[in-house]
């Protein structure tokens, strides 16, 4: 098994489902909000672990409610989090925008 140490960011991705993308200045109500693990380094570490590597991670999260969800998939993927520090600050956050377009002709 390959050994790998990843040094990078751990963020919490905030995902809210909406019926459509808002217009400039418009407020839409969302539903089904989720907090998922994210961050370039964390995503790379999880991918490597899922491919069978023995992964250790070096990074930091904040001491706020987003820290645990941000590390959830890393922990459940078997990544060694012994070098992850918990800083007296906020965990990095990202708001994810994803648009899915389908053609009316694709009613299969």
For the regions a language model picked out, list residue spans one by one:
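A glycine-rich helix N-cap at a beta->alpha junction
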Residues: 77-88
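Conserved small/polar residues in nucleotide/adenosyl-binding loops
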Residues: 101-106
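Glycine-rich phosphate/adenosyl-contacting loop at the front of the ribokinase-like
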Residues: 1-60, 65-69, 75
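Short beta-strand scaffold segments in enzyme catalytic cores
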Residues: 93-97
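A structure-centric signal for secondary-structure junctions around beta-strands
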Residues: 1, 90-92
């Amino acid at each position: 098994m390959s050994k790998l140490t990843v040094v990078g960011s751990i963020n919490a991705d905030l995902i809210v489902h909406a019926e459509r993308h808002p217009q400039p200045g418009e407020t839409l109500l969302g539903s089904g909000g989720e907090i998922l693990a994210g961050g370039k380094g964390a995503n790379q570490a999880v991918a490597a672990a899922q491919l069978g590597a023995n992964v250790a991670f070096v990074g930091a999260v904040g001491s706020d409610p987003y820290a645990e969800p941000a590390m959830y998939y890393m922990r459940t993927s078997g990544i060694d989090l012994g070098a992850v520090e918990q800083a007296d600050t906020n965990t990095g956050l990202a708001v994810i925008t994803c648009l899915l377009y389908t053609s009316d002709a694709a009613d299969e």
